[in-house]
């Protein structure tokens, strides 16, 4: 068997930090899939032994695809799946054509892992429920469940792992991404530099707001609470951001920016109501 599938990045239309609970911050966000030039292509086939190939920037044990497979294997064991079903994961040859940059706020590693879990469930006809896939996805990484969901637009809550479809006109073909070369943002450093400015109470209002309205009425620092700490901790990012027009928005903890296609400088005229 040979299966090939494409994986697209996400952007955060808005990302609002609520409060810290345990080691991590609770948040609310709107994630949208972006089908533009950036995509990873993953091929999965049966082989004599396991292999995972791709231009990855981390050791195998830290790779999100490898992590997803270990979590999946343990899950199948806990559900008493047959020995042959579990063994089938040990003879997969997985190859990734990697184009989505990492440390860019685009969910690159999570996209690959989420896509793999979603597609393996179909390839092997395991009939795992979305909830079961989500329980594994949240162990891989906070953004993974958005990619498992296959939604084009969704609200993410809790630590980012609770996903709810958001019904709206999809923006997947209307957005373009700018991912600066050689500028990497450390999510950990940015969260450490984050300082809450006000007590955030507008959760429900944000989660109801259409993405297009957010982009047309707010500027990038109003939409993303991590922009300021990212600029504080990264000089290269600061240099790039200062040159960008108002139509550009910041995704995740960076370093990528995105905008509506065919928007000009100064396209955002009205002020965001927070």
Curated annotation (Swiss-Prot):
| InterPro entries with a match to the protein in the record | GHMP_kinase_C_sf, GHMP_kinase_N_dom, IspE, Ribosomal_Su5_D2-typ_SF, Ribsml_uS5_D2-typ_fold_subgr
> Which molecular function GO terms apply here?
4-(cytidine 5'-diphospho)-2-C-methyl-D-erythritol kinase activity; ATP binding
One GO BP annotation is: terpenoid biosynthetic process
- DNA damage recorded as keyword: no
Please name the top-level EC class of this enzyme.
transferase
> In what pathway does it function?
Isoprenoid biosynthesis; isopentenyl diphosphate biosynthesis via DXP pathway; isopentenyl diphosphate from 1-deoxy-D-xylulose 5-phosphate: step 3/6
Q: Name one Pfam family in it.
A: GHMP_kinases_N
- Catalytic activity of the protein: 4-CDP-2-C-methyl-D-erythritol + ATP = 4-CDP-2-C-methyl-D-erythritol 2-phosphate + ADP + H(+)
Q: What is its EC number?
A: 2.7.1.148
Highest taxon above the source species: Bacteria
Q: Tell me the keywords, alphabetical order.
A: ATP-binding, Isoprene biosynthesis, Kinase, Nucleotide-binding, Transferase
Which residues does the Swiss-Prot or TrEMBL record annotate as the active site?
10, 143
Which amino acid positions bind ATP, per UniProt?
101-111
What does the function comment of this entry state?
A: Catalyzes the phosphorylation of the position 2 hydroxy group of 4-diphosphocytidyl-2C-methyl-D-erythritol.
Alphabetized NCBIfam families for the sequence? ispE, PRK04181.1
Name the family: Belongs to the GHMP kinase family. IspE subfamily.
Q: What is this protein called?
A: 4-diphosphocytidyl-2-C-methyl-D-erythritol kinase
- Which lineage do the record's taxonomy fields give for this organism? Bacteria, Pseudomonadati, Campylobacterota, Epsilonproteobacteria, Campylobacterales
């Amino acid at each position: 068997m040979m299966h090939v599938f494409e994986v697209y990045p996400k952007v955060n239309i808005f990302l609002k930090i609520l409060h810290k609970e345990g080691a991590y911050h609770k948040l609310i966000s709107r994630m949208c899939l972006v089908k533009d030039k950036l995509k990873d292509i993953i091929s999965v086939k049966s082989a004599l032994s396991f292999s995972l190939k791709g231009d990855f920037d981390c050791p195998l044990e830290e790779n999100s695809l490898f992590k997803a497979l270990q979590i999946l294997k343990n899950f199948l064991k806990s559900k008493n799946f047959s020995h042959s079903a579990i063994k089938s994961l040990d003879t997969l040859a997985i190859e990734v054509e990697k184009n989505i940059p990492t440390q860019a706020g685009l969910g690159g590693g999570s996209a690959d892992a989420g896509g793999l879990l979603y597609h393996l469930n179909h390839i092997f006809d395991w009939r795992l429920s979305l909830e079961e896939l989500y329980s594994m996805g949240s162990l891989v990484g906070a953004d993974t469940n958005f990619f498992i969901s296959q939604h084009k637009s969704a609200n993410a809550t809790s630590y980012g792992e609770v996903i709810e479809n958001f019904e709206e006109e999809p923006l997947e073909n209307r957005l373009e991404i700018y991912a600066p070369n050689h500028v990497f943002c450390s999510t950990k450093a940015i969260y450490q530099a984050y300082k809450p400015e006000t007590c955030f109470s507008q959760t429900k209002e944000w989660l109801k707001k259409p993405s297009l309205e957010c982009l047309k009425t707010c500027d990038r620092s109003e939409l993303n609470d991590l922009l300021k700490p990212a600029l504080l901790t990264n000089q290269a990012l600061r240099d790039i951001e200062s040159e960008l027009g108002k139509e550009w928005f910041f995704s995740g903890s960076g370093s990528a920016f995105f905008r509506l296609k065919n928007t000009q400088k100064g396209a955002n005229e009205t002020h965001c109501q927070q």
